[in-house]
């Protein structure tokens, strides 16, 4: 992996990992009480665990592959690494991830190369962050015994992971109706909602369908705009502004997330409220992010890695986990710029969430 010039290494500092309990400002604390569930659709074990407990002093090679550099996915990687460090100290083993980390920068050819290199490096496990990463890594380990543990796969069934015995992980499945209810609660009588997403992002497919169904049921008109690059997303955002929408919904879409810092000011200037499927959007300027605690998601992912490597489990023994979606994150700077009463906004949101957190605009969680 060390000779892959095309692969961008992390720009964030590992020093932040030890502070994961406070790293997401107020956000991480807000999500700490969220619970997880295992999927009833997960694969049942077809074989007994083949391994045994790890020996003290043992070193495991852990490949970690990030799909693209943005706040939510970076936060997951930091959390996975921090948790693996803690588990390693507890169990007296070493998880070597530093030599086997890569960021594909949303490039499929990069993902393919990373997968091939990790297999050639004979890593013990691959942690795949985001749906495209997980799908590519699963293909890469075919005909090997290298397990894949994914994180932030919104719809594992739609991604084709059901029935696959060599993959498991954690899902950030989105409660779209809850987000749509937030929009309506903040804008009584709203008659048009914009949808901004990337058609090529599998994670957006079901959420967009759910949003359309909600709008149809409630007599709300939908205006859809799409983009696959930051430049296209900027044009799509401008088109939504021109269409006169008052609120825009975006699911857990990596393409839009990567572009959020480039579009949020245009939305603010036009008085458009952006409601999204992850806290990182709010961090990058959107009015509202809704969803899981990505620190907790990363920690649970690392726990699954430990169960595979240290406890002799197989992916088939570990059904994928989903987490309660109930955390609303409000960008207070954006709310003020839009002329919204923060106290009134929180009161309107209360019936549809478990926690309300606040952030101000930044590139990454500090």
Residue ranges and their predicted role:
Residues 154-164, 168-192, 292-313:
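Hydrophobic alpha-helical segments within soluble ligand-binding/sensing domains
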Residues 62, 80, 169-218, 314, ...:
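An alpha-beta-alpha
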Residues 99-160, 253-268, 272-274:
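Beta-alpha junction/loop-to-helix N-cap segments that form part of ligand/metal-binding clefts
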Residues 61-87, 98-109, 200-204, 253-258:
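Extracytoplasmic "Venus flytrap"
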Residues 27-41:
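Bacterial lipoprotein signal-peptidase II cleavage site
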Residues 307-366:
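Hinge/cleft segment of the Venus flytrap/periplasmic-binding protein
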Residues 88-107, 166, 215-230:
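Short beta-strand elements in bilobed, periplasmic/extracellular small-molecule ligand-binding domains
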């Amino acid at each position: 992996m060390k000779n892959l010039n095309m692969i961008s290494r992390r720009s964030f500092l590992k020093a932040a990992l030890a502070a994961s309990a406070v790293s997401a400002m107020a956000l991480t604390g807000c999500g700490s009480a969220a619970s997880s569930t295992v999927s009833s659709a997960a694969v049942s074990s077809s074989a007994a665990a083949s391994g045994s407990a790890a020996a003290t002093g043992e070193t495991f090679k852990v490949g970690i592959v990030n799909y693209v550099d943005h706040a939510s996915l970076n936060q997951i990687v930091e959390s996975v690494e921090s948790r693996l460090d803690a588990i390693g100290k507890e169990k007296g083993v070493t998880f070597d991830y530093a030599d086997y980390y890569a960021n594909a920068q949303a490039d499929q050819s990069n993902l393919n190369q990373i997968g091939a290199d990790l297999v050639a490096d004979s890593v013990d496990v691959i942690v795949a962050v985001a749906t495209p990463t997980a799908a590519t890594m699963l293909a890469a380990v075919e005909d090997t015994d290298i397990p894949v543990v994914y994180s932030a796969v919104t719809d594992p069934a739609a991604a084709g992971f059901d029935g696959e015995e060599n993959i498991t992980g954690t899902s950030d499945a989105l409660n779209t109706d809850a987000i749509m209810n937030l929009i309506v609660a903040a804008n009584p009588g709203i008659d048009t909602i914009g949808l901004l997403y990337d058609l090529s992002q599998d994670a957006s497919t079901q959420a967009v369908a759910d949003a359309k169904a909600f709008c149809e049921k409630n007599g709300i008109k939908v205006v859809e705009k799409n983009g696959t690059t930051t430049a296209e997303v900027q044009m799509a955002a401008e088109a939504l502004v021109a269409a006169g929408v008052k609120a825009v919904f975006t699911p857990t879409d990596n393409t839009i997330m990567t572009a959020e810092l480039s579009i949020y000011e245009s939305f603010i200037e036009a008085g458009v409220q952006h409601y999204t499927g992850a806290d990182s959007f709010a961090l990058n300027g959107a009015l509202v992010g809704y969803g899981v605690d990505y620190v907790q998601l990363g920690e649970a992912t690392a726990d699954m890695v430990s169960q595979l490597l240290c406890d002799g489990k197989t992916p088939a023994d570990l059904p994928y986990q989903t987490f309660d979606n109930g955390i609303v994150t409000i960008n207070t700077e954006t709310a003020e710029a839009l002329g919204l009463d923060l106290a009134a906004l929180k009161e309107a949101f209360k019936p549809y969430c478990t926690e309300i957190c606040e952030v101000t605009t930044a590139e990454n969680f500090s």
